Amino acid sequence: MNIADGRQAFPAPAKLNLDLRITGRREDGYHNIESIFCLIDLQDTVYLKPRDDGKIILHNPVGGIPQEADLSYRAASLLQKYARNLAGVEIWLDKKIPTGAGLGGGSSDAATVLLVLNRWWQCGLTQWQLIDLGAALGADVPFFIFGKNAFASGIGEKLIGMDIPKQWYVIVKPPVHVSTAKIFTYEGLTRDSASSIMPTFQNLQPFRNDMQAVVFKEYPEVWKAYSELSKYGSAMMTGSGACIFAAFQARNSAYNIYRQVSGLYEAYLAEGLSKHPLLSV
């Protein structure tokens, strides 16, 4: 979508972890995981405007984060060395995905920047080269570059497409920010879940999140949100939190529950997607 001042708008959808298991700790300090990643239509909008002077400018960093530390800025900087010319860009972020929520908003913004600038700057990187680049920014970035619902392993960079039934999701965000680093270093965190032999949507059920019990213990507000949403369906935490979600087969059912919980919490009604909106552009 073109707007008056030459910026162009690009979507950056959120994700849910429908299943998340920690299968081991790596020597580099990261953890190996297995997870089902699902795209949803809750999304940020990334506005980009090309420059020909090599400058990268992020106009509205999120939450006081320095420009150089923002994932979108870092994504552009990382890709710039592959550009054919003196390429630059201006970036604006219209945030709709809540931060610190386990929905991958910052990672999705960064992935959108990589996908678009790879074309604009004529970098010529393949999807898997971009995925490798994205892994240096964060464990969720590769999935958004992959652009389809997936079973992820490794630290999240090994991806296999997965068919997920069409569902609607009610998402609630408790008034707390969960520290991912704190959860991953927690002594009682499950780190030895068995690896899946035949990972399919059906075979992995019942779904679980190995971080959930630790987060509930350390952040009672997340437990309260889980308890509330569990009154209406099978609730689960996404990522390392803080958001809790429940899946429904029909939009009307999801909407009715959304109306119930939106008076108590910051809440969202989202539709599952089969692929990244940029793949349709």
Swiss-Prot record:
GO molecular function terms attached to this record: 4-(cytidine 5'-diphospho)-2-C-methyl-D-erythritol kinase activity; ATP binding
What keywords are annotated for this sequence in UniProt? Answer: ATP-binding, Isoprene biosynthesis, Kinase, Nucleotide-binding, Transferase
For the keyword Thylakoid, the answer is: no
The pathway is: Isoprenoid biosynthesis; isopentenyl diphosphate biosynthesis via DXP pathway; isopentenyl diphosphate from 1-deoxy-D-xylulose 5-phosphate: step 3/6
Q: Which residues bind ATP?
A: 98-108
According to its UniProt record, the EC number is 2.7.1.148
Reactions the enzyme catalyzes:
4-CDP-2-C-methyl-D-erythritol + ATP = 4-CDP-2-C-methyl-D-erythritol 2-phosphate + ADP + H(+)
Q: Name one GO biological process term.
A: terpenoid biosynthetic process
Keyword Cell inner membrane (UniProt):
no
The catalytic site is made up of 15, 140
Q: What does this protein do?
A: Catalyzes the phosphorylation of the position 2 hydroxy group of 4-diphosphocytidyl-2C-methyl-D-erythritol.
NCBIfam families to which the protein is assigned, alphabetical: ispE
Which family, according to UniProt? Belongs to the GHMP kinase family. IspE subfamily.
Q: Protein name, please?
A: 4-diphosphocytidyl-2-C-methyl-D-erythritol kinase
Encoded by which gene? ispE
